[in-house]
C-alpha cells in the first residue's frame, strides 16, 4: 500500500540522510567547481497544492549530485543556507537573481572569491528565440559566433586534452576573435534604434550585456563548464514527471524525494546501478556499518564493513 511504501521510504531516509551529508561535504570541498539549478514542483500545503521549488547542485569532478529543498522557497537564502561556508572556485547557473550575489564583494563577503558563471547556452537560446520567433536576422551573427565557441569545446572534448591545455586554447586567438566579434556587434546593436528590434532581440541583447563577464568566465580555467547542461539534465526527471502530474503531499515528501534523488542521481552519474548500490548500502547498514564515507558510491566496493 501507499502507507507501507511511505513508511519504508521514511525508514530508509534515516540512513540516507547521513549519506547525503557525506556527499554534500565531498561536493562542496574547497575550490570545487559546481553547477546549480532549480525547478518547480507541486506540494500540498494547507489543503491546496502550491508551486514550490527543488534545487540541485552538481560537482562533475567528484560525480556527485545533491538535491535540496527548503519549504519550497526559490529565495537566495535556500542557496546560502545550503552552501554555508563553502569556499567554491566557481558556481555555474542561469541568470536568475538568486545567484547574482556570487562573486560580488559588494553584495556578500562570504562568496566574493567564488567565480559566478552564467550559462552560455542560455544566452544562445535567447538569440535563437529572437531569430525563430522574432524573425530578427541580426541574431545570426551572434549565433554564428556563440556556436563557434561551442564547436571549440566539442573539439577539446574529442581530443581529451588536459584542463591546462583547455585553458590555454580557450585564451587563444580563435576564441578571442569570436568574443571580439560578439562584443562589437553587441555594442553596435545596443546603440541602434529600439523600434528596429523585436522584443525577443532586445531581451537577448540585454541579457548578454548584463551577464557578459559571467558568460565568458569559463575561459579563465579549463575546469570551468561553458554551459549549465549538467545541472539541467539532473533536474530533468522532475520536469518530465511534472507533466505527468507529479506532486508531493507535504514538504516532508519533497524532502524525502530530494534525498533519494540525490543518491540515485549520484550513482547514475558514476555509471553504476542504483538498485545495486542501494542493496549494498543497506546490507552494510544492516550489518552494523556506520562509516558512511566507506559507504559512498565512490567507495562502497572497498567497504570493510560487511
Placement of each model-derived feature along the sequence:
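Catalytic center-proximal scaffold of phosphoryl-transfer enzymes
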Residues: 1-306
Amino acid at each position: 500500500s501507499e502507507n507501507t511504501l511511505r513508511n519504508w521510504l521514511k525508514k530508509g531516509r534515516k540512513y540516507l540522510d547521513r549519506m547525503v551529508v557525506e556527499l554534500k561535504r565531498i561536493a562542496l570541498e574547497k575550490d570545487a567547481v559546481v553547477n546549480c539549478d532549480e525547478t518547480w514542483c507541486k506540494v500540498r500545503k494547507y489543503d491546496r497544492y502550491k508551486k514550490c521549488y527543488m534545487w540541485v547542485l552538481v560537482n562533475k569532478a567528484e560525480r556527485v549530485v545533491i538535491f535540496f529543498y527548503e519549504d519550497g522557497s526559490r529565495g537566495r537564502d535556500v542557496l546560502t543556507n545550503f552552501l554555508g561556508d563553502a569556499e567554491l572556485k566557481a558556481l555555474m547557473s542561469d541568470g536568475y537573481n538568486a545567484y547574482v550575489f556570487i562573486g560580488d564583494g559588494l553584495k556578500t563577503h562570504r562568496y566574493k572569491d567564488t567565480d559566478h558563471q552564467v550559462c552560455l547556452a542560455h544566452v544562445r537560446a535567447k538569440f535563437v528565440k529572437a531569430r525563430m520567433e522574432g524573425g530578427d536576422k541580426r541574431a545570426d551573427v551572434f549565433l554564428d559566433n556563440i556556436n563557434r565557441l561551442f564547436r571549440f569545446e566539442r573539439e577539446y572534448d574529442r581530443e581529451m586534452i588536459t584542463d591546462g591545455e583547455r585553458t590555454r586554447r580557450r585564451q587563444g586567438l580563435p576564441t578571442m576573435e569570436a568574443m571580439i566579434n560578439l562584443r562589437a556587434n553587441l555594442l553596435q546593436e545596443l546603440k541602434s534604434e529600439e523600434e528596429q528590434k523585436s522584443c525577443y532581440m532586445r531581451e537577448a541583447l540585454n541579457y548578454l550585456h548584463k551577464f557578459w563577464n559571467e558568460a565568458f568566465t569559463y575561459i579563465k580555467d579549463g575546469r570551468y563548464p561553458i554551459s549549465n547542461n549538467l545541472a539541467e539534465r539532473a533536474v530533468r526527471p522532475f520536469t518530465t514527471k511534472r507533466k505527468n502530474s507529479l506532486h508531493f503531499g507535504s514538504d516532508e515528501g519533497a524532502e524525502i524525494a530530494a534525498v533519494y534523488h540525490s543518491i540515485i542521481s549520484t550513482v547514475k552519474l558514476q555509471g553504476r546501478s542504483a538498485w545495486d548500490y542501494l542493496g549494498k548500502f543497506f546490507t552494510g547498514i544492516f550489518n552494523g556499518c556506520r562509516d558512511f564515507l566507506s559507504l559512498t558510491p565512490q567507495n562502497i566496493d572497498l567497504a570493510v564493513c560487511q
